[in-house]
Amino acid sequence: MRILGLDIGNKTIGVALSDPLGITAQGITTIKRKGEDRDIEELKAICDKYKVEVIVCGLPKNMNGTLGPQSEKVLKFCNIIEEVINLPIKMWDERLTTVAANKAMLEADLSRAKRKKIVDKMAATYILQGYLDRISK
């Protein structure tokens, strides 16, 4: 069963995909946002191509666990994804995933330009891997 992981931002959507057994996550692309309809179209194409059965979306909570304005945007977009693509959506607490992704890239000594290109895809990978680890227990 393939599972898609998403890190949804205002300008980009990081996308990660599980292996067929649902054990490991791998970043596959970063979608540059071009409007709701086109974003959904791209996500649907990815879901169709890889025969995705579930989508895990990172939910950006505040450090105290409350939901802020960005969370509301993400929840609204995820509701639209669920309606249009017709796949179940699971929300995953994404606190500190971008921080962890940036830290890993700094430790790998990647340049700022290279980090900027892949940070969202890496954050999506962290989100999806966290979910996969949880469901495998």
From Swiss-Prot:
Presence of the UniProt keyword Cytoplasm in the record: yes
Coiled coil: none
Enzyme class label: hydrolase
Organism domain of life: Bacteria
Gene Ontology cellular-component terms listed: cytosol
GO biological process: rRNA 5'-end processing
Main location: cytoplasm
GO molecular function annotation: nuclease activity
Localization per record: Cytoplasm
SMART domains: YqgFc
Keywords assigned by UniProt, alphabetized: Cytoplasm, Hydrolase, Nuclease, Ribosome biogenesis
Gene3D superfamilies on file: YqgF/RNase H-like domain
Enzyme Commission number(s): 3.1.-.-
Family designation: Belongs to the YqgF nuclease family.
Function (record text): Could be a nuclease involved in processing of the 5'-end of pre-16S rRNA.
NCBIfam families: RNAse_H_YqgF
Name of the protein in question: Putative pre-16S rRNA nuclease
The species this protein was found in: Clostridium kluyveri (strain ATCC 8527 / DSM 555 / NBRC 12016 / NCIMB 10680 / K1)
Lineage: Bacteria, Bacillati, Bacillota, Clostridia, Eubacteriales
